[in-house]
């Protein structure tokens, strides 16, 4: 959108020249150009900056007028739909979905209105802009409406939080962003606290670090050095084919999810595609294999062929004790909103089971029944934990 001249002017039919499978890349390239030209990088171009501001104003006007027919509007709506289509496809691929999207066209007007309603009591005028004086609360002062009368990201986030409250009347809203806007979000929530303290109290901000590939390459969405989520999946798939000589999308997806979730939220993530798909160490496939191994034992056993036993031997007791820790671990993960606790537990549980199985015969053993019951509880617990992480627990690791 920031480079309409490259389309030959405002001619929406020119968009047909962009192949369907290249739309996401094209949009990304245009985003990077616009971001760079606006001055988020050091080389700011004032003429381009003003042109982008005017484009932004025109986009707001499109929504105000419900314009779907003008050439500019057709370009805008088409590109926005391309973005939605891409993300819908990707979310389906990773097994998730969003119930509702909140585009800026919905959040910005509400944020603008809300901020204006509280000028004087919460927000103040300053050099033609509207700001929140965060310094009174040990924070910093930020602009919520700029001198052009447009809402900044701060006002849009006020609108987003307000809109979600109107739609869901939630008990808890968790906002997840990068670590670089911790102070920014403190200001936004502190401003809301002044006129809706209950809403601010029900909004929680969690942050994460940056993602780098092993070797130090940073994943970024605002510069030309871009590595998309789909690229991470493709890297894991290639590593899996080389390391395990198998193609299994379910296992690869679980490997990537686990590689991210096992890290405590808040820190940076060093992602190693080969390590993530390995059947050894703290990886998704290791845990999936430990589950498949247990299911294989249960499938081969003829339940009831051995006499019942009472009491537990030391190795059995150790595994049973670890299984029993599961509810407490889940409670802790939920209370802290930290899924890495579940990952750590599942890894330790799988290790415990593997040690147990290596040293204790199960089939055709006088303690077969009690050990099969123990393995059944273990497999169910492992599966439940993986399900909480949205990771599949296959009966067999390789198809």
Describe these PLM feature segments:
Residues 1-399:
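Non-catalytic interaction-recognition regions
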């Amino acid at each position: 959108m920031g480079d309409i001249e490259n389309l030959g002017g405002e001619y929406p039919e020119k968009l047909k020249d962009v192949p369907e499978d290249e739309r996401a890349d094209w949009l990304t390239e245009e985003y990077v150009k616009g971001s760079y030209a606006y001055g988020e990088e050091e080389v700011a171009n004032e003429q381009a900056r003003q042109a982008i501001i005017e484009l932004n104003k025109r986009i707001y006007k499109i929504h105000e007028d419900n314009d779907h027919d003008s050439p500019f509007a057709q370009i805008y709506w088409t590109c926005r739909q391309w973005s939605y289509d891409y993300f819908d496809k990707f979310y389906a691929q990773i097994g998730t979905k969003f119930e509702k999207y909140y585009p800026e066209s919905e959040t910005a007007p509400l944020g603008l209105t809300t901020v204006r309603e509280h000028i004087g009591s919460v927000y103040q005028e300053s050099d033609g802009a509207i700001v929140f004086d965060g310094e009174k609360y040990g924070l910093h002062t930020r602009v919520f409406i700029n001198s052009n009368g447009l809402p900044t990201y701060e006002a849009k986030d006020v609108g987003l939080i307000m809109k979600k409250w109107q739609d869901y009347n939630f008990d808890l809203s968790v906002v997840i962003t990068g670590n670089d806007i911790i102070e920014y979000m403190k200001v936004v929530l502190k401003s809301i606290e002044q006129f809706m303290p209950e809403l601010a109290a029900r909004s929680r901000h969690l942050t994460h670090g940056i993602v780098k590939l092993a070797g130090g390459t940073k994943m970024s969405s605002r510069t030309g050095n871009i590595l998309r989520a789909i690229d991470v999946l493709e890297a894991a798939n290639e590593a899996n084919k080389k390391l395990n000589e198998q193609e299994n999308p379910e296992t690869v997806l679980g490997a990537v999810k686990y590689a991210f979730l096992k890290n405590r939220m808040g820190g940076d993530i060093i992602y190693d595609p080969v390590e993530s798909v390995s059947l050894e160490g703290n990886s998704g496939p290791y845990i999936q294999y430990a589950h498949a191994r247990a299911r294989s034992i249960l499938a081969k056993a003829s339940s009831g062929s051995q006499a019942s036993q009472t009491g537990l031997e030391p190795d059995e007791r150790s595994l049973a004790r670890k299984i029993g820790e599961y509810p407490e671990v889940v409670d802790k993960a939920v209370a802290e909103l930290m899924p890495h606790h579940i990952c750590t537990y599942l890894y330790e549980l799988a290790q415990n089971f593997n040690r147990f199985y290596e040293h204790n015969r199960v089939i055709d053993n006088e303690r077969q029944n009690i050990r099969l019951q123990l393995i059944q509880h273990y497999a169910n617990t492992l599966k439940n934990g993986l399900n909480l992480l949205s990771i599949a627990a296959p009966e067999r690791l390789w198809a």
